[in-house]
A protein has these predicted regions:
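Metal-dependent de-N-acetylase/amidase catalytic core
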Residues: 2-44, 65, 87-90, 97, ...
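Generic hydrophobic, amphipathic alpha-helix propensity
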Residues: 75, 95-99
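ATP-dependent adenylation/pyrophosphate-handling site
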Residues: 37-48, 52-90
């Protein structure tokens, strides 16, 4: 029973909460669709697929407007549910190739993507090295905007990357970039603190004209969205979870101040 609640019932509850809570959250959102496309950006993704789930339409909209977009994928995704017929090294290669394919569908070239290849789930163990590599990229690219996973997400890599993005902003006071966080594993009420929710400056970018291609880019992550090896115990992201990223808009939290901290890990 406990296993059922953890694997099935509670995720379904969170997905239902997203259906109800998302409109309430977005009722006070600022539509930045007309403002953001022309601005260059750096997208920081904790794992292969986060860039597409969280920012796919925004990336396409920027590229269509002629803006420069770079994507950095921080970890190798090795600890996502892995088919037993694949070794860890083979699975890492699959995930990286899927990222290249998905980003190509979004319109990015291979040169636009950087893989840092830190071990999935262990980004916090390499915080200083990750920060230094990201700082070098920021100094080289100097993007007008930075997009990163939400500091409220229920995954340590997502939070560490968000914390690093905030640290980097403080290290570059003379060359500031607007910082936006995109929620992935956000709809878990155990993570929410009223103060944090009230402090969120919520922004949206509409997906008009880009939703079909975003769906194709998500589908390129076959190891994540399908039981692509056909194994009996194969796992895939839940359809209810994926639907959150194929609605009318993409959701972002603009970081005005780095004061908000990560909630306790679950």
């Amino acid at each position: 029973m406990r296993n059922f609640l953890r694997r099935r019932a509670y995720p379904a509850f969170c997905e239902s909460l997203a259906v109800v809570g998302r409109p309430l959250l977005l009722s006070r959102a600022v539509d930045v669709t007309s403002q953001t496309p022309a601005r260059s950006c750096l997208v920081l993704a904790p794992h292969p697929d986060d860039e597409t789930l969280g920012c796919g339409a925004t990336i396409m909209r920027k590229l269509a407007a002629g803006a420069s977009v770079r994507v950095v994928i921080a970890t190798d995704g090795r600890h996502s549910p892995r088919p037993s017929m694949l070794s860890i090294d083979a699975f890492v290669k699959v995930r990286e190739e899927e990222a290249r394919r998905a980003c190509a569908i979004l319109g990015l070239s291979a040169e636009d993507i950087t893989f840092l290849r830190f071990e999935d789930g262990r980004l916090g163990d390499h915080r200083r090295l990750a920060r230094d590599r990201l700082l070098d990229l920021l100094e080289t690219i100097n993007p007008e905007e930075v997009f990163v996973s939400s500091i409220i997400d229920n995954h340590p890599d997502h939070r560490v990357l968000a914390e690093l993005a905030r640290e980097l902003g403080q290290l570059r006071p003379d060359r500031p970039s607007r910082l936006y966080e995109y929620p992935i594993w956000f709809w878990d009420p155990r993570l929410w603190r009223v103060r944090d929710l009230l402090e969120l400056r919520i922004c949206i970018v509409r997906m008009d004209g880009f939703r079909v291609r975003k769906r194709k880019a998500i589908a390129a992550y076959r190891s994540q969205v399908t039981n692509f090896t056909g194994e009996r115990d194969g796992a895939a992201l839940r359809r209810g979870f994926l639907r959150q990223f194929l609605g009318p808009e993409e959701t972002f939290f603009e970081v005005i101040s780095p004061r908000m901290k990560s909630p306790p890990y679950l």
